[in-house]
Amino acid sequence: MKRVAVLSVHTSPLEQPGTGDAGGMNVYVVQTATAMARRGVEVEIFTRATSSELPPVAELAPGVKVRHVVAGPFSGLEKEELPGQLCAFTAGVLRAEARHEPGHYDVVHSHYWLSGQVGWLARERWGVPLVHTAHTLAKVKNLALADSDAPEPRMRVIGEEQVVAEADRLIANTDVEADQLTGLYAADPAKVLVVPPGVDLGRFTPGDRGEARRSLGLAPDALVLAFVGRIQPLKAPDVLVRATAALLERDPGLRSRLVVLVVGGPSGSGMRTPDELVGLARSLGVADVVRFLPPQGGGSLAQVYRAADAVAVPSHNESFGLVALEAQACGTPVVAAAVGGLPVAVRDGVTGLLVAGHRTSDWADALSRIALAPGLREALAGNAVGHARGFSWDRTTESLLAAYGQARDVFREEVYA
């Protein structure tokens, strides 16, 4: 394997996770691409240009290039409008490849269904296998919608079905996602490979909690709960805010110590502040304990995790949940919704607690169990570090490279059959 073309239409690996549409997928693309480059595999990532000031090609790391493809206006486009720009994006990708000798890429790896549509055509034009990672699935999301969330359109469902049918290999984060691909999308089980994501074990490590709190301006004896992620209905930060109100109603004395950190930005074009969540905190009378922080880079984010007594991941659906893994790698227990891949990322009663559903009282119970029981918290924290160390991006990358090799072999057999 010499060269890999990676497609990430709707979000650039250069963007800060936690802003707009940037999240765990960005981390996944960056970490696996750089790990491949360390193994001598050249990686070229194609993403949509969102500014006229972006260079046509940028170096993410030695051996990893990011190619900005002009497809539609640089700003003002919602993700839901991007299907209308797939023709322009695909043309840009094909033009870039045409500058090389035939057979330049060994495989194309698409991320999310929009990229899968582009990868489908690239597969046919370039004569190389297509490996696809969905990251989220419309049918799964529609089965677990938040009250304020809009269902995914039929257009996306059809697009995903097409990509699932055409890809040579489908990468699932967990066995649960693999079952969803075969059960909901009729994927050929032989094409589905389970490859768990990793965590940056050099960046997310246990550290001095007191120092972490000082860096964030928090009192040493504060009771700190944290949410990290994009502020959108799917991620359900409102669940933590409501649980905070329930905790204070049960024990008003906690107000002097309790700090709830909400770290992330609103998801969507043109949004600057999490207005609805701020309004909810005010209406529930907890605005004085809820602090909103912008998305944090790796080192600063690790300090947030270390400072917290517990990290809440109340999502309505997660294909895996990288935030849960990062927090545990820092020695912080996680309270997570028992959905999607989170039961794999968090071992219930061992590294954190899983909550069935999103009822406020259940979340308040789980958070108080950890935060108000130092013995339990320390036991979970110790186990969490060991659990997280079982996941690494190097291991993920080795599995992906093996999947690429399998896809190439199968593709060649089909071509020469």
Swiss-Prot record:
Positions annotated to bind UDP-N-acetyl-alpha-D-glucosamine: 16-17, 24, 230, 235, 296, 318, 326
Keyword Thylakoid on entry: no
UniProt binding sites for Mg(2+): 305-306, 308, 332
A Pfam family recorded for this sequence: Glycos_transf_1
GO molecular function: acetylglucosaminyltransferase activity; D-inositol-3-phosphate glycosyltransferase activity; magnesium ion binding
E.C. code: 2.4.1.250
Record's catalysed reaction(s): 1D-myo-inositol 3-phosphate + UDP-N-acetyl-alpha-D-glucosamine = 1D-myo-inositol 2-acetamido-2-deoxy-alpha-D-glucopyranoside 3-phosphate + UDP + H(+)
Keywords of the record: Glycosyltransferase, Magnesium, Metal-binding, Transferase
Family: Belongs to the glycosyltransferase group 1 family. MshA subfamily.
PANTHER family the UniProt entry points to: D-INOSITOL 3-PHOSPHATE GLYCOSYLTRANSFERASE, GLYCOSYLTRANSFERASE
HAMAP family the record matches: MshA
Function description: Catalyzes the transfer of a N-acetyl-glucosamine moiety to 1D-myo-inositol 3-phosphate to produce 1D-myo-inositol 2-acetamido-2-deoxy-glucopyranoside 3-phosphate in the mycothiol biosynthesis pathway.
Subunit details: Homodimer.
Family annotation (NCBIfam families): mycothiol_MshA (TIGR03449)
Name assigned to this protein: D-inositol 3-phosphate glycosyltransferase
Organism: Actinosynnema mirum (strain ATCC 29888 / DSM 43827 / JCM 3225 / NBRC 14064 / NCIMB 13271 / NRRL B-12336 / IMRU 3971 / 101)
